[in-house]
Amino acid sequence: MSDTEERVKKIIVEHLGVDADKVVQNASFIDDLGADSLDTVELVMAFEEEFGIEIPDDAAETIFTVNDAVKFIDKASS
């Protein structure tokens, strides 16, 4: 597991209060982890703060899963 993935998972567990075992790469924030639209906005803000990046609204609207977040963050950080 990459450092980015570990940090993303930690943020998700903290913000959504879900079991870390449920936070797998293909887990959907809404369908699998029980997030609502406000939760997803808060997750994006937490990712921005944790990784020191900006996630534009149009990009945020394409981040649905743990893997989507990890891929975007890795690309934005490189």
From Swiss-Prot:
<dbReference type="Pfam" id="PF00550">
    <property type="entry name" value="PP-binding"/>
</dbReference>
<keyword id="KW-0597">Phosphoprotein</keyword>
<comment type="similarity">
    <text>Belongs to the acyl carrier protein (ACP) family.</text>
</comment>
<keyword id="KW-0963">Cytoplasm</keyword>
<comment type="function">
    <text>Carrier of the growing fatty acid chain in fatty acid biosynthesis.</text>
</comment>
<dbReference type="InterPro" id="IPR006162">
    <property type="entry name" value="Ppantetheine_attach_site"/>
</dbReference>
<keyword id="KW-0444">Lipid biosynthesis</keyword>
<keyword id="KW-0275">Fatty acid biosynthesis</keyword>
<dbReference type="GO" id="GO:0005829">
    <property type="term" value="C:cytosol"/>
</dbReference>
<keyword id="KW-0596">Phosphopantetheine</keyword>
<dbReference type="GO" id="GO:0031177">
    <property type="term" value="F:phosphopantetheine binding"/>
</dbReference>
<keyword id="KW-0443">Lipid metabolism</keyword>
<dbReference type="GO" id="GO:0009245">
    <property type="term" value="P:lipid A biosynthetic process"/>
</dbReference>
<feature type="modified residue" description="O-(pantetheine 4'-phosphoryl)serine">
    <location>
        <position position="37"/>
    </location>
</feature>
<dbReference type="InterPro" id="IPR003231">
    <property type="entry name" value="ACP"/>
</dbReference>
<keyword id="KW-0276">Fatty acid metabolism</keyword>
<dbReference type="InterPro" id="IPR036736">
    <property type="entry name" value="ACP-like_sf"/>
</dbReference>
<feature type="domain" description="Carrier">
    <location>
        <begin position="2"/>
        <end position="77"/>
    </location>
</feature>
<dbReference type="GO" id="GO:0000035">
    <property type="term" value="F:acyl binding"/>
</dbReference>
<dbReference type="GO" id="GO:0016020">
    <property type="term" value="C:membrane"/>
</dbReference>
<comment type="pathway">
    <text>Lipid metabolism; fatty acid biosynthesis.</text>
</comment>
<dbReference type="InterPro" id="IPR009081">
    <property type="entry name" value="PP-bd_ACP"/>
</dbReference>
<dbReference type="GO" id="GO:0000036">
    <property type="term" value="F:acyl carrier activity"/>
</dbReference>
<dbReference type="InterPro" id="IPR020806">
    <property type="entry name" value="PKS_PP-bd"/>
</dbReference>
<protein>
    <recommendedName>
        <fullName>Acyl carrier protein</fullName>
    </recommendedName>
</protein>
